[in-house]
């Protein structure tokens, strides 16, 4: 296993486990086992330990989700349709409960925001980054800056809540309900 391989495998395993089990439910030994990387490589690549690994996992998810949102928004001229396209894509993961990926950063944010300032900040930056994609599209289509900022925050909160509700329901109905409300939300 090469230098980059080992690091990427550790980060990939950690990202998936943090999404599914949270920060406190995920142990370093489990990450090592699932990644297949040598134990010493974890601290070599992540000298800051579990917290550094979690921050990098959040940053990976931030970029991954930002790109998914951007792709959906760019494919549509209407911001509401772009958001609905993202919600449709997101809701597909709930059609098979074995494939559910968990919360992109929500679980980590809820668990650690009061205990780890660097991890809280990483989660906050992820949410800001995602909101900025919605906000930019809304401004491009004539929405005022203040209204675009407000609407993007509401959309982000609705989606994060919808993911949580869909996880507990083990279906995509909450996300689909949110999707149907998006056009009216953006009209006001």
Swiss-Prot record:
GO terms for molecular function: DNA binding. Keywords: DNA-binding, Repressor, Transcription, Transcription regulation. Signal peptide: none annotated. Residues 4-64 form the HTH tetR-type domain. Gene3D superfamilies: Tetracycline Repressor, domain 2. Acts as a repressor of the lincomycin-resistance (lmrAB) and yxaGH operons. This is HTH-type transcriptional regulator LmrA. It comes from Bacillus subtilis (strain 168). The gene is lmrA.
């Amino acid at each position: 296993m090469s230098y980059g391989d080992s690091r990427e495998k550790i980060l990939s395993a950690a990202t998936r486990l943090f999404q599914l089990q949270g920060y406190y439910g995920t142990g370093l030994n489990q990450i090592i086992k699932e990644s297949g990387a040598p134990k010493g490589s974890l601290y070599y690549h992540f000298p800051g330990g579990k917290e550094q690994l979690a921050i990098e996992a959040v940053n990976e998810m931030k970029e991954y989700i930002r790109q998914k949102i951007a792709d959906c928004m760019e494919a549509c001229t209407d911001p509401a349709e772009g958001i609905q396209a993202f919600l449709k894509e997101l809701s597909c993961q709930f059609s098979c409960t074995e494939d559910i990926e968990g919360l992109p950063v929500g679980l980590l944010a809820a668990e650690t925001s009061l205990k780890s300032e660097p991890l809280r900040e990483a989660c906050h930056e992820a949410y800001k980054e995602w909101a900025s994609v919605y906000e930019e599209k809304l401004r491009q289509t004539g929405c005022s800056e203040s209204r675009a900022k407000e609407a993007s925050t509401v959309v982000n909160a609705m989606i994060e809540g919808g993911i949580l509700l869909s996880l507990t329901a083990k279906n995509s109905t909450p996300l689909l309900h949110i999707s149907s409300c998006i056009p009216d939300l953006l009209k006001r």
